[in-house]
Every structure is written in C-alpha cells, then in structure tokens.
Amino acid sequence: VVDAIRASKGSTLFVCSLADMQGETWGLTAREHVEALMDHGTRGLLDYVLVHTPVSLRPDSPATGVFTAVTGADSEHASTADLDDLVLSGRIRPVRVCYQDVQAIQAQGPVVIARNLVDPIHPTWHDPAALRDAFAGVLKLCRSRRR
C-alpha cells in the first residue's frame, strides 16, 4: 500500500478514528495514530489529517466530553441502543486530540483539519454529512495548493 501511495500523484488524507476499541490502537491519541502511520512507512506521504473535535482547539484546552456515555465513565446511564453489539465496559475510548497534538502533527508536514465529525445517533461513528463537507474542503485545499 505504501508503495502505491508513493507512486501516486494524488494527495493523501488520513481520517482519524473517533473512538477505538481494545486492541492495537487502544488509548492512542490522534497524534499517536499519525505517528504510527508514519513509523510504518507513510512519513512524508500524508498531506492532510482529519480529526474530530467537538470544540475549537486552543493552546490550553484539550477536547473532551463528547464520548462520556460510551467510554464507560457513565455506563449506568448510557444507552446501548445506538451502539449495536458493543458492551459499555470501558472497551471504547475516544481518540483524543489537543492543540499541542495538532501543532506536532503539522510540524511533520500534514495539514490538520479539525471538525466536529461525530454522528449524533451513533457517537462512535463519523457523520456522513460532516465527512462529505470535510472532504469537499480538502478537495478545495488540494486545488488551491496546485496553483
């Protein structure tokens, strides 16, 4: 895959997960996701990184709070109706991002685009309309960089 990306003339976009479940990416921040990709051969190949944040990122405020109900922090009151077969036992965590992470990612080359991407009905899924709008913005950026 990395060789195909390297051979391509197209721009690349990494869409960071909203939440992760137990496994290889358990507990990773958005920055750590990007660094893992770079460590596996994509260094210098990522043009854009799309991350979810429910609030504007500022130097002193990490984005938190949207996933309280699905992280197990409030599992007594959380609804499982929109989580399909997932069990609320702390096995789902948000992929966190903060201002410093965005700065660190951009220092390595990619442009970071931070948007509220969560599906209001399925809080661990990306909202298709929000993704569409973000992708349209990336396409505009790609065209403007070519000029």
PLM segments and residue spans:
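Histidine-anchored nucleotide/phosphate-binding helix
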Residues: 1-7
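A short helix->loop->beta-strand "cap" motif at the edges of active sites that frequently abuts
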Residues: 7-12, 110
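Generic beta-sheet signal
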Residues: 15-17, 52
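Cofactor-cradling patches in redox/metallo enzymes
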Residues: 21-25
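C-terminal functional extensions of proteins
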Residues: 27-147
